[in-house]
UniProtKB/Swiss-Prot annotation:
ValRS has two distinct active sites: one for aminoacylation and one for editing. The misactivated threonine is translocated from the active site to the editing site. The C-terminal coiled-coil domain is crucial for aminoacylation activity. It comes from Enterococcus faecalis (strain ATCC 700802 / V583). Keywords: Aminoacyl-tRNA synthetase, ATP-binding, Coiled coil, Cytoplasm, Ligase, Nucleotide-binding, Protein biosynthesis. Residues 808-879 form a coiled coil. This is Valine--tRNA ligase. Monomer. PANTHER family: VALINE--TRNA LIGASE, CHLOROPLASTIC_MITOCHONDRIAL 2, VALYL-TRNA SYNTHETASES. It holds the Pfam family Anticodon_1.
Length: 880
């Protein structure tokens, strides 16, 4: 055999994966085939933010997409997997501002234009890092079509959509309560707000009635906003306060009268049943204020400090003002009590500060008509299909309850809003291009929410608004979107309604929703916990294929997956098993070419069985891939490869390979190569590097496994009789191995093997295949008959259609074996006692790290199982 056909003795992923990706790129294998007769299949990558490194969640997300696209490519589809990245507005701007702050520079020092130049430099650097990570993962992306959400083509699409929605009265400018980040000084979308449970307080205060007839008790968590109160409210049906409705109270510290109003919003059962109404600082109060025509008093600046309407508290930070106001209320005798409590408080995802509900003039998308169209589409044949289906209800519920979408951001990095204001008249103009006399106009300084442009991703990347674009005509709507359940509302939903509005089509046929990657203890990975895993570190240690196998094998639609290094070890071991099996095949087919593969001649039962099992595996895996049930597909592949091919067929093939029948050798060699070839094709979408490496070393046709034909079922290979017979044969061999282990007898020691069966098919099959029984069971006497009497001194096993007996006379000394097992039992009993002593020690359980305690519990379980198994063996021997 020539040197280049050998596989190295050891599987070393780093050496195998190095250079392979570039070779694929050089061969131009990731672009669409261009075959107009082929059915198109397209995926657009969920664009990662250009903010830094990709995390394990990205690795999972992109692995699933790559698996789908690689399989479809092999199945003959005209595939496009389009890469791209998201400018990620606030996230990227915050990173660059942080970097500049380390040099003592603010964005205001640079000015808008120079600051944006700095962000573009950041984008180029991190886009390069992301591409390197994609390459390490082996992602078969068509880089010739790579897009960025601030590309000119995509920017044109953004302007077109904005102007069109504005002209349809679906975009408007108005004053509303929005999420405000006082540090970044910008509005935030709901997804940019992270809710954390923190310790806070309910401050109970008394507001005196203006007529001096008493006081009303109010409770709030934000006393600093009371300076902006313009009413207090009770429920119209609350009998306790009927006589108060229409009266006024004096607002403490401000000394102004505000009305007592009645509104259904008030919960009679909560607190005192009286609430303060601050329309400029609370979204619910804003709605109440609109219903009752209340003034809106905004007492805070953009940076979270108190403004001139806050009186003596002007200039104070909002939390410092809270302390001062509480102190002053106490001094006035208006503070009744303070109750400590835990409550959920919104924090900015990017800056970490507490988000302030704030009255602000912003741009909004009117969601009602758009949501209605999206919901109606889900009742048609063109509905987007969710995997798992329960997320369709999640989508519909969100659409039913959706609020208008605030789309303006007070940032410099992003799509600047295409609206201009006349310098003299204040007239507003909205259009695709700036006004002709641009010197007389000033453009709106705000930019659009990142999600506005990413909502257009599936069609803007294909050339829209140029609907004559070749890619748009060929690949839109796309076939499948793969994404996590955490952004179904904020991205998936918006893509659906924008696509329906502007193209009249759903953006994708299927949405595969996966869960989150968690650590071994089930916790979400986060910086604060320090439990994040860099996928590049995992690849460095185990290789990309092992990581991809783990990610695919733990994948069920909608479910979370737990990462552990133990699972990574198992992934590596599986690939190593494939590697060693491939080395065996390659060494035994020396000199063979693809043209030599021929198994049309007589086949052994093992040959017929492995081809039948291959057919079953191909059918099942293909079906499971179509349903996106990759975890189950992985289990099917694992069982077929590890058990059927490696542990059974390869071992059985040795009888032929090491024999003298040349015709049988040719058939078995051909089936070994063919089955391995089909295995590599089935595995290639999941573990592309190692499969390509091995495939190049076996007899094959074609330039690359990337574009090789995916396996299909060959009905002529099915042999149910061989499959049934082999299952019985395997049962016999497994049972004999188990009995040998139980009585501590090695394979080298011959046995008497008696097989009793009343099943003619089983009897004929076993009788015709005694050579396998002789090889794997080493019997000095083998009897297969209907007339066997159970020996007195024997171990037995009941099988499918048969019963076997293994006489122990002369094989073992039962008393000696019992004595040996009793010593082993004593050992496990002591181990159980030791570990249970540890676990019953409260100090150990309380003080030891969780992982140490869990390890001891795992030991206890293991020792108890071993103790029980030995007890059973002793009882079995004593019963003979």
């Amino acid at each position: 055999m020539s040197e280049e056909k050998n596989l190295p003795t050891k599987y070393q992923p780093t050496e195998i994966e190095a250079g392979r990706y570039q070779k694929w790129l050089d061969q131009d294998l990731f672009k669409p085939s261009g075959d107009k007769k082929a059915k198109p299949y397209s995926i657009v990558i969920p664009p990662p933010n250009v903010t830094g490194k990709l995390h394990l969640g990205h690795a999972w997300d992109t692995t699933l997409q790559d698996m789908i696209i690689r399989q479809k490519r092999m199945q003959g589809f005209d595939t496009l997997w389009l890469p791209g990245m998201d400018h990620a507005g606030i996230a990227t701007q915050a990173k660059v501002e942080e970097k500049l702050a380390q040099q003592g520079i603010s964005r205001y020092d640079l000015g808008r234009e120079k600051f944006v130049d700095q962000v573009w430099e950041w984008k180029e650097e991190y886009a390069s890092h992301i591409r390197e990570q994609w390459a390490k993962m082996g992602l078969s992306l068509d880089y010739s079509r790579e897009r960025f959400t601030l590309d000119e083509g995509l920017s044109e699409a953004v302007r077109k959509v904005f102007v069109s929605l504005y002209e349809k009265d679906l975009i408007y400018r108005g004053e509303y309560i929005i999420n405000w980040d006082p540090k970044a000084k910008t509005a935030l979308s709901d997804i940019e707000v992270i809710h954390k449970d923190i310790e806070g307080a309910f401050y109970h205060m008394s507001y005196p009635l203006s007529d001096g007839s008493g006081v009303v008790e109010i409770a709030t968590t934000r006393p600093e906003t009371m300076l902006g109160d313009t009413a207090i409210a009770v429920h119209p049906e609350d009998e306790r306060y009927q006589e108060l409705i229409g009266k006024t109270v004096v607002l403490p510290l401000v000394d102004k009268e505000i009305p007592i109003i009645a509104d259904d919003y008030v919960d009679m059962e909560f607190g005192t049943g009286v609430v303060k109404i601050t329309p400029a600082h609370d979204p619910n109060d804003f709605e109440v204020g609109n219903r009752h025509d209340l003034p809106r008093v905004n007492v805070m600046n953009e940076d979270g400090t108190m403004n001139e309407l806050a009186g003596k508290y002007e200039g104070m930070d909002r939390f410092a003002a809270r302390k001062a106001i509480v102190s002053d209320l106490k001094e006035l005798g208006r503070l009744i009590k303070i109750e400590t409590m835990n409550h959920s408080v919104g924090h900015s995802e990017r800056t970490g500060v507490v988000v302030e509900p704030r009255l602000s003039t912003q741009w909004f998308v009117k969601m009602g008509p758009l949501a209605e169209k999206a919901m109606k589409n889900q009742e048609t044949e063109d509905a987007v299909e969710f995997y798992p289906p329960r997320f369709n209800q999640t989508f519909l519920r969100w659409m039913e309850n959706v609020h208008d979408w605030v789309i303006s951001r007070q940032l410099w990095w992003g799509h600047q809003i295409p609206a201009w204001y006349h310098k003299e008249t204040g007239e507003m103009y909205v259009g695709m291009e700036e006004p002709a006399d641009s010197e007389n106009w000033v453009q709106d300084s705000d930019v659009l929410d990142t999600w506005f442009s990413s909502a257009l991703w599936p069609f803007s990347t294909m050339g829209w608004p140029n609907e004559a674009s070749e890619d748009y005509q060929r690949y839109f709507p796309t076939s499948t979107l793969v994404t996590g359940y955490d952004i179904i509302f904020f991205w998936v939903s918006r893509m659906i309604f924008q696509s329906l509005e502007f193209t009249g089509e759903r953006p994708f046929q299927n949405v595969l929703i996966h869960g989150l990657i968690r650590d071994e203890q089930g916790r979400k990975m986060s910086k604060s916990l320090g439990n994040g895993i860099d996928p590049m570190d995992v690849i460095e240690k185990y290789g990309a294929d092992a990581l991809r196998w783990f990610l695919s094998n733990g994948s069920a639609p909608g479910q979370d997956v737990r990462f552990s290094y133990e699972k990574m070890d198992a992934s590596w071991n599986f690939i190593n098993k494939i590697w060693n099996a491939s080395r065996f095949v390659i060494m035994n087919v020396e000199g063979m070419t693809a043209a030599d593969i021929d198994f049309s001649g007589e086949k052994t039962v093992a040959d017929r069985w492995i081809l039948t099992r291959l057919n079953e595996t191909v059918a099942r895996v293909t079906e499971l891939f179509d349903r996106f049930e990759f975890g189950e597909a992985g289990r099917q592949l694992y069982n077929f490869i590890w058990d059927d091919f490696c542990d059974w067929y390869i071992e059985m093939s040795k009888e032929i390979l090491y024999g003298d029948n040349e015709a049988a050798k040719q058939t078995t060699r051909s089936i070994l190569v063919y089955t391995l070839d089909q295995i590599l094709r089935l595995l290639h979408p999941i573990m592309p590097f190692v499969t390509e490496e091995i495939w190049e070393k076996i007899p094959h046709q074609g330039e690359s496994l990337v574009v090789a034909e995916y396996p299909v079922v060959h009905e002529e290979f099915n042999d149910e009789a061989a499959a049934r017979g082999m299952e019985v044969l395997k049962e016999v061999i497994r049972s004999v191995r188990n009995i040998r282990a139980e009585v501590n007898t090695p394979l080298s020691k011959p046995i008497t093997l008696l097989i009793k069966t009343n099943d003619t098919e089983v009897e004929e099959f076993l009788t015709a295949n005694t050579s396998y029984l002789e090889r794997f069971c080493n019997p000095e006497e083998l009897v297969i008959s209907r007339e066997i009497e159970a020996p007195e001194l024997a171990m037995s096993a009941v099988l499918t259609g048969a019963e076997l007996f293994l006489p122990l006379a002369g094989l073992i000394n039962i008393e000696e074996e019992i004595a040996r097992l009793e010593k082993e039992l004593d050992k496990w009993t002591k181990e159980v006692k030791r570990v249970q002593g540890k676990l019953s020690n409260e100090r150990f359980v309380s003080n030891a790290p969780d992982e140490v305690v869990e390890a001891e519990r795992a030991k206890e379980k293991d020792y108890l199982e071993k103790q029980e198994a030995v007890k059973e063996r002793i009882a079995q021997l004593r019963s003979i």
